[in-house]
Amino acid sequence: MDDDAGDGAASGGTKRKVTAASSSAAAKGKAAGKGKAASKASALATAKESSLLKQKSPAEFFAENKNIAGFDNPGKSLYTTMRELVENALDSAESISELPDIEIIIEEITKSKFNTMIGLVDRQRIDEELYDDFESAKAREKRLAKEARFQETQAKNAALGKKVKEAPAARGKGRGEAAFFRVTCKDNGRGMPHDDIPNMLGRVLSGTKYGLRQTRGKFGLGAKMALIWSKMSTGLPIEIKSSMKGQNFISFCLLDIDIHKNVPHVHLHEKRENKDRWHGAELQVIIEGNWTTHRSKILHYMRQMAVITPYAQFLFRFLSDSPDKNLTIQFARRTDVMPPIPLQTKHHPSAVDLLLIKRLISETTKQNLLQFLQHEFVNISKSHAERLIGEMGPDFSAKTTVKSLTSQQLVRIHQLFRQAKFDDPSGNCLSPAGEYNLRLGIIKELHPDLVATHASSPQVFEGHPFIVEAGISIGGKDVKHGLNIFRYANRIPLLFEQGADVITRTALKRINWSSYKINQQQDKIGVFVSIVSTKIPFKGTGKEYIGDDITEIASAVQSALKQCCLQLKSKIVKKLQARERQDRKRNLNRYIPDVARAIMETLGEIADESPPKRPRYDKEDEELLEKVNSEEVTEMTFRDCLTQHVEQVDYEMALEYAMQSGVSEEPREALYLNSLEGSYKFIDFQSPVFVFRFIP
């Protein structure tokens, strides 16, 4: 009985296991079915999302691709913000022919001060290990030991006269604590119309600089990108003060930008009293930045801008809570000669594409094809336009309505423009700095020993005119040994990606400096090249350099630098000759005592000899020997005569050098003309040789 019962129990247990296993399998099957259904639903949702059409505003695009506009990191963002504001200020002042007077202030804002500005209360840390700068006791001990070894090594190097390195900064794994700066730029320019301020600064890709002309900007963003970066890094609006000439009020505007809609978001827009009758603009923006990493770039930019715009006055200030970090630099105005304002020009036929032709047709006020060709393009006269129309084919005539042209006809016009011959565009629309300003700027900032400048005539690249200006200096203050290359495009400095630039490569590889008596390794050489054009062929997304693949520009840069080198060579050769002359005089003076003594001894021996039966000397020689015998002529006499002869030869050579170089080193004498009647004030006429003055 018991055995049977046990068998029954075992059998029942087996049945229960089978039932449980089958129910488990069923559950797994249901779960797998649910998983497949969920996966299918997720795939459908993804497909549905990917099929949705999305759009981005221009502001949103540049916010997501801020590196295109030069906002790669906080340090470069600080540099680019300052640069954009300065260039806007220069454009504004030059547009009304006002000598620019620009003040730039970069103020460091501490974290606690920034939190106070935005109404955020500082909070004490609770979990120290959560933070990136947390350091355990063991790690701290290891770091201090490493720093002690480093300091010991540097002390030994200093004792031996070797170069001492700075201690490496500790780096964490995270981004670290952000640093904030208030950037302010004030100018004396045109100012902005009160009602236009929101759209001028709060709407990306809208402005007054669009058109075919020489412009400083690269993208037409200006302060708008600084505002986008401010919104991304601090969330604070930009503050604008502006007043135009003759206005009795100052426009005050506080605004930011709606990134997704690309429209301005105005917080405050009002008119305030203008007691001082000030005109210009003052922009103030608070952004995240890094002064430490880009301090040198910012100062180099200001110095190079002072070189290319010597007619402007810049006051740069950096303010910090630590007084020893404060910095004030003034770049004084050196001249009041300003370049002409760049003029807007029409398109050259060889430089247009099909899309541009369509846009010009949609915007033109001309009715027929003949008028359209004459008035919408440069270098197409009436007779030339008639010849072009005749070449287009039977479907075209001078009276053809431009609005009725088909796509095929537009392609035909475009093809003819690419193949036909046109005169090169003139450079009248360009505004180079000018040789005078470039030379003054170099002298003002570098104080070189020698300087030479050259400006090329207008040349053409793909239908766009360009002018190359170059300057080379030798010596000067704050200039390193070797080549110091300063690059400009449309009168703005280019500081990044120098290695691939056409100016750098030309200076390094295409100029044989030694043939111009210039030592490329030891001399302090400043190479300045400025290229202005209606279209600068920048390379790279950041537009920081000009490519070396454009033959016309590379050839023009090389030619301009060679012209400067030729000027310097003649000056260097004359300088070497003058140095050789001085060395020769010094050497002659050194040997005068020995020569005088030798002559005196020789003459003394001859004079002591018994007189010959037949005369061997001329009468003058006999007289000299008698004077030697009577000690009327001594060694000092010969010294004086030799010294006078050396001085005479030196004077004659100096006079010849002065006549060749155009600079007289002769003593200057005042020349006066006295007026017999009347009392007048006359200016002095000065030259390297004399001063001409009327005396009443």
Swiss-Prot record:
Write out the biased-composition intervals (Low complexity). 20-36
Q: Where in the cell is it found?
A: Nucleus
Q: What is its EC number?
A: 5.6.2.2
Name a GO molecular-function annotation. protein homodimerization activity
Q: What is its main location?
A: nucleus
Region of interest: Disordered = 1-36
* Record-linked Pfam families: HATPase_c_3, Topo-VIb_trans
> Biological process GO annotation list?
cell morphogenesis; DNA endoreduplication; DNA topological change; pattern specification process; response to brassinosteroid; trichome differentiation
Q: Which residues bind ATP?
A: N88, D187, T208, K209, G217, K218, F219, G220, L221, G222, A223, K224, K543
Tell me the InterPro entries matching this sequence. Answer: HATPase_C_sf, Ribosomal_Su5_D2-typ_SF, Ribsml_uS5_D2-typ_fold_subgr, TopoVI_B, TopoVI_B_transducer
Q: Recite the UniProt keywords alphabetically.
A: ATP-binding, DNA-binding, Isomerase, Nucleotide-binding, Nucleus, Topoisomerase
Secretion signal span: none
Q: Which reaction does it catalyse?
A: ATP-dependent breakage, passage and rejoining of double-stranded DNA
Question: What's in the GO CC field?
Answer: cytosol; DNA topoisomerase type II (double strand cut, ATP-hydrolyzing) complex; nucleus; small ribosomal subunit
Q: What class of enzyme is it?
A: isomerase
Protein's job? Component of the DNA topoisomerase VI involved in chromatin organization and progression of endoreduplication cycles. Relaxes both positive and negative superturns and exhibits a strong decatenase activity. The B subunit binds ATP.
Q: What is annotated about its quaternary structure and interactions?
A: Homodimer. Heterotetramer of two TOP6A and two TOP6B subunits. Interacts with SPO11-4.
Q: Which family does it belong to?
A: Belongs to the TOP6B family.
**PANTHER family, from UniProt?**
DNA TOPOISOMERASE 6 SUBUNIT B
State what protein this is by name. DNA topoisomerase 6 subunit B
